[in-house]
Amino acid sequence: MQKFHVYGQSRLNGEVNISGAKNAALPILFAAILAEEPVKLTNVPELKDIDTTLKILQQLGVVTYRDEQGAVHLDASNINHFVAPYELVKTMRASIWALAPLVSRFKQGQVSLPGGCSIGARPVDLHISGLERLGAKIVLEDGYVKAFVDGQLIGKRIVIEKVSVGATLSIMIAATLAKGITVIENAAREPEITDTAVFLNKMGAKISGAGSDIITIEGVERLGGCEHSIVPDRIETGTFLVAAAISGGRIICKNTKASTLDAVIDKLRDAGAKIEVTENTITLDMQGNRPKAVNIRTEPYPGFPTDMQAQFTLLNMVAEGSSKITETIFENRFMHIPELIRMGGKAEIEGNTAFCHGVEYLSGAEVMATDLRASISLVLAGCIATGETIVDRIYHIDRGYEHIEKKLRGLGAKIERFTEKIVD
């Protein structure tokens, strides 16, 4: 099993190139199932979840390859299989996005009930109910979600019960080939949804309102090919900004969009960071200072993102003062806190709220990653702690951060990946 060995007390300084957003690349890759002509995607990150998605698409009959420049090419013109199998789906909850384009274009699709990270309940109910509203017949059988439609999906007005990025994407993707007009109300507003809509429109879809809470889709008969560049990863950007903030450093994030990170940037400024933005860069300078504690409440976009909660929990554990962190999106998303406490952090958990009390320094320890964002907070903690830190189960990190140790080393971190030999 691979682990990270992190040597502490590094001040992180320098420049880092931000990768394409995994949370946009995944739905866009699945949406390419709709295309009757070849698609070319650039700025697609090299991640375990991307590799899994490409394997699922290949299983369905999509021809895929990466060229020498890193662009991903997809040809879904000869799809001949309509089942996303358990052995691939079990590692990634986003696999449910395969269902909508399959049933929309081919009138049938089966996806194994997905696995993925261990952040509480992430039910597929909203995906299913949305497809049913469009006319799909869905059964749960033998561990699979099986969807069929007689004739064609029919556009409807759909009010999503609880704001959901996944369900918004599923309904929007399915509705592109539905008959008539679909209106999604209480839609999620994340930039990754907007990027997916831009991609679909390039293929010939007629989508308006993405980025607002009402999205309108006028169904079309077919979708063609296109070229598209994935938007920058705002969560990776935020993660590196926090890395500089907790270490007293200065960082320039390049190839990113500050406009998608307003809530995070506001909190970093509250914590004492000096931040300057241009069209595609963000510069953060802590000028050697320790951050100030900031209260956090996670909310759907454009509120503070749940995917930045673990990183700010770490920031608050080494900040001046005490803070309150409220997690409103997912249950069971404080699993990093006991590990940070093992490193000398001080915090109490009460339901969906954590109370953090800043300490001057953390101490290196052996810690275990539990999910993607929790795991990166442990790596960053190791970068600033005294002594050495071993981070176990780093496969979580490989799901969402491209070349993470290379990027951190470029900023001055002392980090090595190693494989622990298992002795019988």
From Swiss-Prot:
One of its GO terms (biological process) is regulation of cell shape. The keyword Transferase applies. The active site is at C117 (proton donor). It comes from the Bacteria. It is found in: Cytoplasm. The keyword Cell wall biogenesis/degradation applies. Its EC number is 2.5.1.7. Keywords: Cell cycle, Cell division, Cell shape, Cell wall biogenesis/degradation, Cytoplasm, Peptidoglycan synthesis, Pyruvate, Transferase. One of its GO terms (cellular component) is cytoplasm. Pathway: Cell wall biogenesis; peptidoglycan biosynthesis. It catalyses: phosphoenolpyruvate + UDP-N-acetyl-alpha-D-glucosamine = UDP-N-acetyl-3-O-(1-carboxyvinyl)-alpha-D-glucosamine + phosphate. GO terms for molecular function: UDP-N-acetylglucosamine 1-carboxyvinyltransferase activity. UDP-N-acetyl-alpha-D-glucosamine binds at R93, R122, P123, V124, D125, L126, K162, V163, S164, V165, D307, I329. InterPro entries: Enolpyruvate_Tfrase_dom, Enolpyruvate_Tfrase_sf, MurA_subfamily, RNA3'P_cycl/enolpyr_Trfase_a/b, UDP_GlcNAc_COvinyl_MurA. Phosphoenolpyruvate binds at K22, N23. The modification 2-(S-cysteinyl)pyruvic acid O-phosphothioketal is found at C117. It holds the Pfam family EPSP_synthase. Cell wall formation. Adds enolpyruvyl to UDP-N-acetylglucosamine. Belongs to the EPSP synthase family. MurA subfamily. NCBIfam families: murA, PRK09369.1. HAMAP family: MurA. This is UDP-N-acetylglucosamine 1-carboxyvinyltransferase. The gene is murA.
